[in-house]
Amino acid sequence: MLIIETLPLLRQQIRRLRMEGKRVALVPTMGNLHDGHMKLVDEAKARADVVVVSIFVNPMQFDRPEDLARYPRTLQEDCEKLNKRKVDLVFAPSVKEIYPNGTETHTYVDVPGLSTMLEGASRPGHFRGVSTIVSKLFNLVQPDIACFGEKDFQQLALIRKMVADMGFDIEIVGVPIMRAKDGLALSSRNGYLTAEQRKIAPGLYKVLSSIADKLQAGERDLDEIIAIAGQELNEKGFRSDDIQIRDADTLLEVSENSKRAVILVAAWLGDARLIDNKLVELA
């Protein structure tokens, strides 16, 4: 497994792979890897000849400096996990390598609408940072496919739109959420939970499932469903942050023409902001 930290060396390897006619898959990550990331790697390996995993804690997508400062940097452990998975290439650049002149004056990619709604409304600049770094990685790695987790549902929708709008010839693969046995969605942020909070955390998925059951039973008073769910989260020990029920295909308000809904939930548990989602077919 090659570990590359500079743009010239990455370009050199990508040119070689292209000359050899290899099909390349990219798995963009911020490190602190868990089994959910490994599922992305496995999906990439099944679809391509060569798998490139990027590990880069992107300062441009953090709306709070304290979150950036405390995000775990576990490069050695991450590389050991990826080596066991027989990943071909790890791209682990420094911030200076990606943003040599800083982030303030760096060219950015913005996806209007999707960047500022839902999660984007409460995290200004976050999705602009995501679309900028992902587009830069696409230009550098030139992958045939790229794998992203469905846990970050809005992010996946944003990347699909960016790829379509910008004409990237890349297949975007959404990989289903991986959960612990008790239902908690795997996330790097779960590491912020204390032992006691970890026992409470599966309650998020239980509330999510309760909303889904109501929708599948034909309930359509969305305001009431959301209000009850928020109350349930608070009673379980969370601080409900945002609960949305949206059209899964547009992320707009659910209408009588909507065929699928996505339930998007965000809640604080201690210092961890947990997010989860669930798709529901509407009768």
Curated annotation (Swiss-Prot):
Q: Which domain of life is it from?
A: Bacteria
Keywords of this protein's UniProt record, alphabetized?
ATP-binding, Cytoplasm, Ligase, Nucleotide-binding, Pantothenate biosynthesis
E.C. number(s) listed in UniProt: 6.3.2.1
Entries under CDD domains matching the protein: PanC (cd00560)
Cellular component, GO annotation:
cytosol
Reaction catalysed by this enzyme: (R)-pantoate + beta-alanine + ATP = (R)-pantothenate + AMP + diphosphate + H(+)
Chain residues that bind beta-alanine? 61
The annotated active site, in chain numbering, is 37 (proton donor)
Q: In which pathway does it act?
A: Cofactor biosynthesis; (R)-pantothenate biosynthesis; (R)-pantothenate from (R)-pantoate and beta-alanine: step 1/1
Gene3D superfamilies from the xrefs? Answer: HUPs (3.40.50.620), Pantoate-beta-alanine ligase, C-terminal domain (3.30.1300.10)
> Which InterPro entries does this entry report, sorted A to Z?
Cyt_trans-like (IPR004821), Pantoate_ligase (IPR003721), Pantoate_ligase_C (IPR042176), Rossmann-like_a/b/a_fold (IPR014729)
Q: Which residues bind ATP?
A: 30-37, 149-152, 186-189
- The protein's assembly and partners: Homodimer.
Q: Which PANTHER family match?
A: CYTIDYLATE KINASE/PANTOATE-BETA-ALANINE LIGASE, PANTOATE--BETA-ALANINE LIGASE
Name the record gives this protein: Pantothenate synthetase
